[in-house]
Amino acid sequence: MIALSFNYKWRPQQEIIASQKIAEFSKVKMIEVPVPYIQQATDLRLEGYPIPSATNAPEGFIPLRNLLFYSIAAYYAEIYGYNFIIGGHIKEDTQTFPDTNLPFFEKLLKLIKESKHKYDNRPIDFVFPLVDMNKIEIIELALKLKVPIDLTWSCYGDFAKPCGLCKSCQKRAKALRELNIKS
């Protein structure tokens, strides 16, 4: 098993550090994939790109993010001989971002399978163990599995500590509050 971390432009440094710490804690090799040309729609707008799809986009939206990331993950699965690509999307993601729902991944998987060499019959599939769970259920599962929640990062901002203002911080804080856990 390997973990992939996509380092796109303006990705929060604390998120990168959290990924590294979790991989180390889990004793999983992490490969950091530089994708400096990928950035959030709001940042692209600031650089002068029109980005029509970002007009009403949710916070953190990156155009075609999962098409790109999962295609790269399929490449790594191919060269390492892995049969599964595991994603961490949760129920709330599927309600916010169009490229996190199962129909999207069914279509993408079909394309990936069609792209594989005709002599390579190894199966490949996506696995999304958290896709039907909300943040509260995920935190409960994390506690049960003794996942070090303090190593995780949810903030969209690039600060030493979570901003507490972005939607991701607010959702995390609400879930922790409902479970009577101090953040």
What role is predicted for each listed range?
Residues 158-159, 180-183:
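Short cysteine/histidine-rich metal-coordination sites, predominantly Zn2+-binding motifs
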Residues 1-146:
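ATP-dependent adenylation/nucleotidyltransferase module used to activate substrates
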Residues 67, 71, 153-174:
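Local cysteine-cluster metal-coordination motifs and their immediate loop/turn environment
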Residues 149-151:
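Short hydrophobic/aromatic-enriched beta-strand-loop microsegments
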Residues 93, 176-177:
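Glycine-rich nucleotide phosphate-binding loop and flanking beta-alpha elements
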